[in-house]
């Protein structure tokens, strides 16, 4: 098996605190439960024929359009007006950088590995998430689904990331908190670490790197 030359990190839930905490804070401030939010998403998806989150994360749907359709559905479900304006700002207000993992990425760069962020994200949120860590100081490549028109676990976003890193699939390792994204990466030959905790992810990454030195 080829030596790992590049490490690809997810953003939300890996380089940040768990996403569930931000969703929980939003539901508390809005009075909309996660269950109701999920029901609204499913109803909008049934009408559109596609999950609206997928279109949001591939730039086919703006944040305003996405939140507007959910607000209309939630208003119908709950029988009261629901406003979702400022969702992104409220969401990021409760998201914290995962400093130990960010420091580990910085260490890997110093050890000679090429680094990338491959994120399913929202076009309008780019200034918010980039403000959370020194992206350009640590990472060689950023692949953001909202600007590429493809999202994990679709193969094309992995291929784009590998191409921009200049490495073959067998020389790359992905760290992601979504298991299906890890499985999709493995299917094309990328090693993958399923992130469940910072300590576990670092240990599993070190084990996968083997000799601990990049090319």
Model-identified regions with their sequence ranges:
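Generic structural signal for small/hydrophobic residues in well-ordered secondary structure
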Residues: 10-13, 59, 108, 117, ...
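Short, flexible loop segments at the rims of nucleotide/cofactor-binding pockets, characterized by
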Residues: 91-96, 120-121, 150
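Residue-level recognition of short, well-ordered coil/turn positions
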Residues: 60-61, 113, 147, 166
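Asp-based, Mg2+/Mn2+-dependent phosphohydrolase catalytic module
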Residues: 1-5, 9, 122-123, 127-215
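Glycine-centered short loops/turns at secondary-structure junctions
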Residues: 110-112, 189
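N-terminal helical cap/lid subdomain that shapes the substrate entry/recognition surface
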Residues: 2-102, 110, 207
């Amino acid at each position: 098996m080829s030596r790992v030359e590049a490490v690809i990190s997810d953003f939300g839930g890996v380089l940040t605190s768990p996403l569930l905490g931000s969703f929980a804070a939003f539901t508390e401030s809005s009075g909309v439960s996660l269950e109701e939010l999920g029901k609204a998403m499913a109803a909008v998806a049934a009408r559109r024929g596609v999950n609206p989150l997928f279109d949001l994360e591939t730039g086919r749907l703006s944040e305003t359009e996405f939140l507007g359709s959910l607000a209309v559905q939630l208003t119908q479900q709950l029988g009261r007006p629901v406003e979702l304006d400022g969702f992104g700002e409220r969401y990021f207000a409760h998201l914290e950088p995962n400093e130990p993992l960010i420091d580990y990425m910085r260490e890997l760069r110093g050890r000679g590995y090429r680094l990338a962020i491959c994120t399913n994200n929202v076009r309008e949120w780019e200034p918010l998430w980039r403000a959370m860590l020194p992206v350009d100081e640590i990472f060689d490549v950023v692949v953001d689904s909202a600007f590429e028109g493809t999202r994990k676990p679709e193969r094309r976003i992995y291929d784009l990331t590998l191409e921009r890193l200049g490495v073959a699939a067998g020389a790359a390792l992905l760290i992601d908190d979504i298991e299906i994204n890890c499985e999709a990466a493995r299917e094309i030959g990328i090693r993958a670490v399923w992130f469940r905790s910072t300590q576990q992810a670092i240990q599993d990454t070190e084990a996968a790197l083997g000799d601990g030195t990049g090319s």
